Regions:
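Terminal intrinsically disordered/low-complexity segments used for targeting and assembly
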Residues: 2-14, 19-73, 154, 238-285, ...
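Periplasmic alpha-helical coiled-coil/stalk elements that build and connect Gram-negative outer-membrane
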Residues: 3, 23, 146, 162-279, ...
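Small/polar, glycine/serine/threonine/aspartate-rich low-complexity segments that form flexible
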Residues: 43-46, 50-59, 108-135, 258-276, ...
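Transmembrane beta-barrel architecture of outer-membrane proteins
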Residues: 64-66, 128-130, 177, 222, ...
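A glycine-/polar-enriched beta->alpha junction
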Residues: 70-79, 89-101, 133-152, 162-169, ...
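A short glycine-centered flexible hinge/capping loop motif at secondary-structure junctions
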Residues: 210-214, 419-423, 460-464
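Short terminal targeting/anchoring segments
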Residues: 216-218, 423-445
Length: 477
């Protein structure tokens, strides 16, 4: 009897296996987006790419390294994104389990006394026992509905991991830029202190000249105003440093540790002085937001397959095999075997357009994801192109500001000597001090802008997922 039972099961399994190759998922074609094949202002000749460059290979400051490490461990946005990815991974495992039949074992035992009036005048005690294995309501995936849903769940998980990576890149770049602002405020404080000290020295000399009648009280008041201006600039830099540290504390989700390594000056923040874009726009595929958009498109593609499969019959199998007896000792004796096989089929006939509407909606959602993918690529291309052209202009502007700062510093030094010897006037000295300080401040601000641009370009090119270039896993691990 058991042999006769297994034959139809094996035949059904063979047919199901033969039909399981059928799938309704449309063939995936990556959308072609109209962007330039190469980036303007990218003249780098080496083959290094940002995505293959670890953030410790890019940023040079050990203090910044430590802050990034803490942020990747404790930042709430990244932890939320990572937990979302884990939840979707488990959801994918649940969906994948639907591809296979669920096998359950069961055992039952009962002992019952029947009243005498119901048992022909004499009370009777009856027993029954059974054990078995069964498959309950397993739907054969003949037209790929389960596999389409499984593929959609997998792409949803991949999308969540890409979203996590995007948050990762944002944190690395945000911590770097906040740290650069803190370094900038620190150096602006030192510059204001040096200028304040120089102006106080000049003021003391001017006081002597005023007593000697060489300069007027007006000249003295002008120098006092410059001293007050330098003091105000110093206090502004102190405020900016505190605010930058507050921003860093939010990013790392804790107060700044007291044992951080000493920081490097703004001029020594990078190990790589010039980051090439990679010559072609294909480098955009390294960006997590592009990967996330593509996985969303593939998920929508798989949903079309599930909607198509809903038009076809669904076959559900329920079956069991086991043994039963009215005596426990005879439960596994020959002849006490049992089996049951109950297939069912559901054929959609009249759905009043619901299935057609469901398929049309799936196709529309797929087209929406195509548009979203194209928009993501266009936005990514613009991010890189803007960062590259900004880098080109910022480098030229920075070089010009450096020359300007040096020229004004030389001029100030000469006028200070001339002022001491009574050749230059107090007005000449005031103008030279203002010009030199303004040039130094502009050069410092230019340094900050260049550093922020380098951090933005690194992120725009998909860099920052790895700690070191030879890492195979995420930098957060």
């Amino acid at each position: 009897m058991k042999q006769n039972f297994f034959k139809p099961l094996l035949s059904a399994a063979a047919v199901a296996a033969a039909l399981s190759g059928c799938t309704m998922i449309p063939k995936y074609e990556q959308p072609q987006v109209a962007v330039s094949e190469t980036f303007k202002y990218d003249n780098a000749q080496n083959s290094i790419q940002a995505a293959s460059l670890g953030w410790q290979d890019y940023f040079a400051d050990p203090r910044l390294h430590r802050l990034i490490e803490i942020a990747l461990e404790r930042n709430t946005d990244l932890r939320t994104a990572a937990l979302n990815a884990e939840a979707l991974r488990e959801q994918y495992r649940i969906t994948r389990a639907n591809l296979f039949p669920t096998l359950a074992a069961n055992g039952n035992g009962a002992r019952q006394r029947t009243a005498a009036d119901l048992a022909g005048g004499r009370a009777a005690i009856t027993e029954s026992y059974s054990v078995g294995l069964g498959v309950s309501a397993y739907e054969l995936d003949l037209f790929g509905k389960a596999r389409s849903n499984n593929r959609a769940a997998l792409e949803s998980y991949f999308n969540s991991t890409a979203a996590r990576d995007a948050v990762h890149l944002t944190i690395v770049a945000s911590v770097a830029k906040a740290y650069f602002n803190e370094r900038y405020a620190e150096e602006a404080m030192k510059l204001a202190q040096n200028v304040l000290k120089t102006r106080e020295q000049t003021y003391r000399l001017s006081q002597l000249k005023h007593k000697a009648g060489v300069i007027s009280a007006v000249d003295l008041r002008q120098q006092e105003a410059l001293i007050a201006s330098a003091q105000a600039d110093y206090e502004t830099a102190v405020k900016n440093r505190v605010q930058a540290r507050n921003a860093l504390s939010v990013l790392i989700n804790q107060p700044l540790p007291d044992d951080l390594p000493a920081g490097l000056p703004l001029s020594r923040q990078f190990k790589v002085s010039r980051l090439p874009a990679g010559l072609t726009s294909d480098v955009l595929l390294n960006r997590p937001d592009i990967r996330a958009a593509e996985h969303s498109l593939k998920q929508a593609n798989a949903n079309i397959g599930a909607a198509r499969a809903a038009f076809f019959p669904s076959i559900t199998l329920t079956g069991s095999v086991g043994s039963a007896s009215n005596e426990l000792n005879n439960l596994f004796k020959s002849g006490n075997g049992t089996w049951a096989f109950a297939p069912s089929i559901n054929v959609p006939i009249f759905t009043w357009g619901a299935l057609k509407a469901s398929l049309d909606a799936a196709k529309i959602r797929q087209q929406i994801q195509v548009v979203n993918y194209e928009a993501a690529v266009q936005s990514a291309f613009r991010d890189v192109a803007d960062a590259l052209v900004a880098r080109e202009q910022l480098e030229k502007a920075h070089a010009a500001k450096a020359k300007q700062s040096k020229a004004y510093a030389d001029q100030l030094r000469l006028i200070q000597l001339r002022y001491k010897h009574g050749v230059s006037s107090a007005l000449d000295l005031l103008d030279a001090e203002r010009s030199s300080y303004a040039a130094d401040s502009a050069l410092l601000a230019s340094s900050l802008t260049r550093l922020e641009n380098m951090a933005d370009l690194y992120k725009a090119l998909g860099g920052g997922l790895k700690r070191f270039g030879n890492d195979t896993g995420d930098a957060a691990k």
